[in-house]
């Protein structure tokens, strides 16, 4: 199926939580003296996240299962790392919908992935900075309905790890 009917994430059905004092990537690069911090808004979701240990091509073993957010990160400088517990090589989010999606991403997508829980049963997330084994076996073994590539454009055009997508696994 080329397209599937998706239901927008219902923000009214979930509790919104906020964290202030967030300085993002652009601040980290520019360090302007008059920067105004942003606020992170996220939704309290009961979905689970499993971070997989991948030590060889096509041989992931199940690792730690936890919630979507590491709220301890909200008290440190890199608050954004609270989403999906940072940039893991391979993670799986259990959703509330049906079907499977593979998200190939940089950290730009971490805050977006929770919104996919309304539409997919399994959301696999790959970050090539920490996943060295190509996608062929992963895709063949998991029968994804859709694949989403979600990057910050500047990162995508200069990502030194994208070649790993084509590594034979």
Where are these regions (language model features)?
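Extracellular glycan-modifying ectodomains
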Residues: 1-169
């Amino acid at each position: 199926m080329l397209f599937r009917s998706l239901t927008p994430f219902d923000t009214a059905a979930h509790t919104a939580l906020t964290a202030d004092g967030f300085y993002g990537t652009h601040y980290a690069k520019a360090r302007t003296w008059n920067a105004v911090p942003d606020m992170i808004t996220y939704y309290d979701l009961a979905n689970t996240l499993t971070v997989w240990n991948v030590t060889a091509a096509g041989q992931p073993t199940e690792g730690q299962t936890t919630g979507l957010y590491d709220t301890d990160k909200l008290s440190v400088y890199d608050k954004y790392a609270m989403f999906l517990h940072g940039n893991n090589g391979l993670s799986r989010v259990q959703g509330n919908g049906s079907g499977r999606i593979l998200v190939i991403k940089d950290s730009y997508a971490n805050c977006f992935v929770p919104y996919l829980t309304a539409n997919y049963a399994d959301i696999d997330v790959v970050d090539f900075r920490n996943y060295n084994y190509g996608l062929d076996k992963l895709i063949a073994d998991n029968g994804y309905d859709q694949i989403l590539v979600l990057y910050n454009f500047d990162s995508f055009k200069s990502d030194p790890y994208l070649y790993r997508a084509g590594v034979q696994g």
